Amino acid sequence: QTNDKEFLPNSKKKWNTFRYNYKLGQLEKVISSLAIDQNNNNLPDLIGLCEIENRSVINDILNTSIFHNQDFQIIHQDSPDIRGIDCALLIKNKFKILKKDFIVIDNPRDNRTTRDIVFVKLEFKNKIFNIFVNHWPSRYGGQENSNYKRVFVANVLKDYISLNTSDDEYTVIMGDFNDYPFNESITKFLMNDKFINLMNNDLVSGIGSYNYRGTWNWLDQIIISSNFSDKSIKLLSFGAFQKDFMLYKNKDGMIYPSRSFGGNTWYGGFSDHLPIYFKSEFIN
């Protein structure tokens, strides 16, 4: 059983067919622009999604024109999140799926259910890749008061990684962490010397993925295992993808991501977060 009340026509946001189809078109525009700009007009091999309502929405995304003649596998299940939103992963069929799992976050100190972490182990060109798609608990109530929730998730994920991955495999941890690269849930509890946070790097492209009260930073991050810097894989680029059409300027001249909603008011934008990406290639 899932909670989809937020996405119905009689909800506070008054979702309807027009708004839904418009949102699909906006997502298509962003993904298409990213493919053109960053990947020679090819769609990404892996696409992580956050705040997805259900499998039907994913199918509708894959039915947009940019995905025609593309063959993606879907990794998703309905999560127990109180808002009815899930994480998902789209994978091109050239990858072989060895294992998939949905890591349940059951914090006894938190009475609000949250999203599962999506995990998949893939094989491609005789290499093993571990992919984790995250959407950690929000800062509702303040960063400090809610910090224990994200620390709990970080510990769950770190333990899972230690039990289900090995040092000769390539690991990618991505998503909306609702914390910044310098917060302790990331630095103290998740990270170690086996990982590199691409958004805590001088080479990162962009000033952030999210603007909170006029300050840009990285709630959305991609963390990779340090062996991505070995001789067989070359890291090409990474950062937040942004185009002018994805942004708006407020009355004070501050630039923000152009969002779909502000509270319950429909603005018809794209998202209050910018998409993040990283690109690598195999070296023969």
Regions found by a protein language model. Name each.
Residues P9-Y20, L43-L49, H76-Q77, N107, ...:
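Second-shell loop/turn segments in exported
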Residues S56-N59, R83-G84, Y140-Q143, Y180-S185, ...:
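Extracytoplasmic/secreted cell-surface and envelope-processing proteins
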Residues D159-T171, N178-N284:
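Metal-dependent phosphoester-hydrolase catalytic domains
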Residues E144-D168:
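A long, amphipathic alpha-helix that forms part
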Residues I52, W136, D176-F177, L274:
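Active-site metal-binding loops of divalent metal-dependent hydrolases
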Residues K127, V133-S146:
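Active-site His/acidic residue clusters
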Residues Q1-S65, I75-S79, I85, D252-M254, ...:
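N-terminal, active-site-proximal structural segment of metallo-dependent hydrolase catalytic domains
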Residues L46-G48, I52-F129, W136:
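Structured beta-strand-rich core segments of catalytic domains in phosphoester-bond hydrolases
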